[in-house]
Amino acid sequence: MNVPLTHLQRLEAESIHIFREVAAAFTKPVMLYSVGKDSSVLMHLAMKAFYPAKPPFPFLHVDTTWKFREMIAFRDQMAQKRGFDLLVHFNEDGVRDNINPFDHGSNTHTHVMKTVALRQALDKYGFDAAFGGARRDEEKSRAKERIFSFRNAQHVWDPKNQRPEMWKIFNTRIASGESIRVFPLSNWTELDIWQYILQENIPIVPLYFAKQRPVVERDGMLILRDDERMKLRPGETVENRLVRFRTLGCYPLTGAIESDADTLEAIVGEMLTARTSERQGRLIDRDEAGSMEKKKREGYF
């Protein structure tokens, strides 16, 4: 008797198929591991896709040196627990020049410490395919991007020159120096992600759960003061509020939301009534009109 697949089972099957397609078609793939909820789901799917073997590719974390401390601790804990090969890359030039979100702004910081750093890492190791956790429901430029997203030798994405994808048939051909960014979660929504995390009991960074945290209200956002590098502006005070994060990145550029959702069930319930994008908590999306597409054209995730 054939039992119809559930919605989550269909999404899972599609993602696993994509992982296996890349492993078969490319010489040196890598998974970009940002440590957030989407990366956690991606890691879980990669483990399933190749079980009982380990995924046949390393996990790459581009460290800006401004991630939440809990994210870094969770990253190292998961690498040890799951036994995957973890590569951590810094833009050493940016570290030397002390590029940071406070003195240089979110645009310069993101370009130097994320985009340029990612291009450096891909060139250094010679990866020809890179898995990412982007979803089409997150943001308009991601909504029009293919699952297999072609990049030229300079890692540039041209949204007007994308390859057709019909009936799950993917064009994996590339010339020397070119690469593909692959997004197995393209057709998932934020709610799908949380329901799958709940169903599969996937470990996630504790920052996603509501807790009393020291935050500063700045530029219309609640910023967690994660260390002493964040100096208070005149008139600012640190308050303890019950908050959690819908999205994670560099702590000075990521806003918390007031919430009492401290369990997976409560988060799923909150998502069922959410009417705003999780990206509203990312300061980098406010740099300028179409800023995400501009970043992606330059080689961003």
UniProtKB/Swiss-Prot annotation:
It comes from Rhizobium sp. (strain N33). Keywords: ATP-binding, Nodulation, Nucleotide-binding, Nucleotidyltransferase, Transferase. InterPro entries: PAPS_reduct_dom, Rossmann-like_a/b/a_fold, SO4_adenylTrfase_ssu, Sulfate_adenylyltrnsfr_sub2. This is Sulfate adenylyltransferase subunit 2. GO terms for molecular function: ATP binding; sulfate adenylyltransferase (ATP) activity. The keyword Mitochondrion does not apply. Sulfate-activating enzymes, NodP and NodQ, may be physically associated. Proposed to provide activated sulfate for transfer to nod factor.
